[in-house]
Amino acid sequence: MISMANILFTEDHEWINVENGVATVGITIHAQEQLGDLVFVELPEVGRTVAKGDGVVVVESVKAASDVYAPVDGEVVEVNDAVASDPSLINQAAEGEGWLFKLKLADEGQLTGLLDKAGYEKLIG
């Protein structure tokens, strides 16, 4: 189970939860509400090195396709195959069981530029 107590957010509507140098990443509830029912998810390969801002995942809904960006630099160490098989998991639990991938952080200092829950709620109004 993902602890949402220390969750951080990006302005691109990703969430990140870091435990022991590994970041779990997904899209926010707000993002999945804007996209609507998800029908396809393209996950990255484990072992891929990504830089902050790189498009890492593609999510497709009946409305649109959207990239999910890396919130920090790191190496993909795990992907959530369950969401590739059943994208509706993201609609059901975007900030929980609908997580997308996990990154081994390259620089924890990059976390300081992310938003806390109050900052994100202010962003989305």
UniProtKB/Swiss-Prot annotation:
NCBIfam families: gcvH, PRK01202.1
Domain of life: Bacteria
GO cellular component terms listed in the entry, alphabetical order: cytosol; glycine cleavage complex
CDD domains per record: GCS_H (cd06848)
Assembly information from the UniProt record: The glycine cleavage system is composed of four proteins: P, T, L and H.
Family: Belongs to the GcvH family.
Keyword field contains RNA-binding: no
Keywords from the named record: Lipoyl
Protein's job: The glycine cleavage system catalyzes the degradation of glycine. The H protein shuttles the methylamine group of glycine from the P protein to the T protein.
Claim: S-adenosyl-L-methionine is one of the keywords in the record: no
Cofactor (UniProt): (R)-lipoate
Cofactor binding annotation: Binds 1 lipoyl cofactor covalently.
A UniProt-annotated Pfam family: GCV_H
Gene Ontology terms describing biological process: glycine decarboxylation via glycine cleavage system
The protein's name: Glycine cleavage system H protein
Modification sites for N6-lipoyllysine: K63
